[in-house]
Amino acid sequence: MTVGYDEEIPFEQVRAHNKPDDAWCAIHGHVYDVTKFASVHPGGDIILLAAGKEATVLYETYHVRGVSDAVLRKYRIGKLPDGQGGANEKEKRTLSGLSSASYYTWNSDFYRVMRERVVARLKERGKARRGGYELWIKAFLLLVGFWSSLYWMCTLDPSFGAILAAMSLGVFAAFVGTCIQHDGNHGAFAQSRWVNKVAGWTLDMIGASGMTWEFQHVLGHHPYTNLIEEENGLQKVSGKKMDTKLADQESDPDVFSTYPMMRLHPWHQKRWYHRFQHIYGPFIFGFMTINKVVTQDVGVVLRKRLFQIDAECRYASPMYVARFWIMKALTVLYMVALPCYMQGPWHGLKLFAIAHFTCGEVLATMFIVNHIIEGVSYASKDAVKGTMAPPKTMHGVTPMNNTRKEVEAEASKSGAVVKSVPLDDWAVVQCQTSVNWSVGSWFWNHFSGGLNHQIEHHLFPGLSHETYYHIQDVFQSTCAEYGVPYQHEPSLWTAYWKMLEHLRQLGNEETHESWQRAA
């Protein structure tokens, strides 16, 4: 299709070009055809995740040094209509006609200055943005630990030794996930896009699907942390079926996919059993990975959709679908069939369940404390833009722009020291919705795969987690300079207990008044 730079292309037309061999995307109101660029893209085919989507967040966060205007012009084919800005009819309704394709603003200096300072710090310390010998050593040790644990699980006494080996397998699988595949599927494990792809495949090795994880984490959680889509939220509260054609990717499936079993957002309708979620929640966390492996992954490849996120950019390709099923079959062979053959069916299935429960518990513990804890913000799309009535403050539950640190930051802006930055700035929202723990610690940074530096990771997902403790002080000082919240807890254990208390508060507070009306 030949079009000019100024030709208007409706977003619904962009949405239709969502296949690996026909990929359009929208960035800052301009439309690009990246189909041919994907084969030569320095980051590999991760660019295809943008197919058919509003991709400003992906573009900004994965290009720390920026992109040449000449490259952008080469693939630009038009612009979004004025007043639409990438929004479909449903978005225009919920955003009250706002012109932005996404509900974030990008006009402040905060993120630009942060990028410049981070790049300068890494250059000063001689650290590459991706890769590093520490990652390779750790990856080798983790893979040896994973396969050794699997071997011992299949050969030791199933009544004791094999159980310990299964728990060990779960722990190593969790850290393969946080320390190898996480960086790999973010394009941050190595400079080589092929090495990153192999690192990303280690998630398939432990039983889950790296491609499904991309939709859940890269397209869902990272751009829209702790935010719930209005239409999606209304569906969950009222029980009314939502037309998936009207749904976009603007929601956080990583955090809120446990509803109604758990209430992790103040906009969700409260059920009677939520008052006990701080008690049963830690047990539920253990089922996180087995649910993903057995049900979620398969559902996504069959429906070509993860909740409200379109998955055609991967699963419209027979090659990707074949890879999915081949990897699933292989993991069933060595993680289920082999233990059942060596230890007997009952013991084999028991050991598989123990391994996954352990893996889920470790992963959920280190992940949930970063986003579900007192002090973080929650919001719907409308609340971020202020088109909804100001949210009611609830004890222990903090809607967007209403945490103590945010209020103090706003108050301090009247002075001459702190620079002003809008609270709906994308980078600010990431700081509002994330929490660090054990900051600056080399040990915890490596042990958790960088999850303890969650704010740094969310603003720069394309950086290797090996770099986070080198740039942590840059983040903290820049946030203070701009009056942006930077919440950090002294340890994982402190964060964990605060998370449990926050679960108790969420389970006992009344449903946010706007959702009560909607229901």
UniProtKB/Swiss-Prot annotation:
SMART domains: Cyt-b5
Localization: Membrane
Motif (Histidine box-1): 182-186
Record function comment: Fatty acid desaturase that introduces a cis double bond at the 4-position in 22-carbon polyunsaturated fatty acids that contain a Delta(7) double bond, resulting in the production of delta-4 desaturated fatty acid docosahexanoic acid (DHA) (22:6(4,7,10,13,16,19)).
Species of the source: Thraustochytrium sp
Residue ranges crossing the lipid bilayer per the database entry: 135-155, 160-180, 282-302, 324-344, 349-369
Record-annotated Cytochrome b5 heme-binding domain positions: 6-81
Cofactor(s) listed: Fe(2+)
Annotated membrane topology: Multi-pass membrane protein
GO cellular component terms given for this protein: membrane
Protein's recorded name: Acyl-lipid (7-3)-desaturase
Entry's free-text remark on domains: The cytochrome b5 heme-binding domain acts as the direct electron donor to the active site of the desaturase, and does not require an external cytochrome.
Reactions performed catalytically: a (7Z,10Z,13Z,16Z,19Z)-docosapentaenoyl-containing glycerolipid + 2 Fe(II)-[cytochrome b5] + O2 + 2 H(+) = a (4Z,7Z,10Z,13Z,16Z,19Z)-docosahexaenoyl-containing glycerolipid + 2 Fe(III)-[cytochrome b5] + 2 H2O; a (7Z,10Z,13Z,16Z)-docosatetraenoyl-containing glycerolipid + 2 Fe(II)-[cytochrome b5] + O2 + 2 H(+) = a (4Z,7Z,10Z,13Z,16Z)-docosapentaenoyl-containing glycerolipid + 2 Fe(III)-[cytochrome b5] + 2 H2O
Renumbered ranges of motif Histidine box-2: 217-222
Keyword Transport annotated: yes
EC number, UniProt record: 1.14.19.31
Residue window of motif Histidine box-3: 454-458
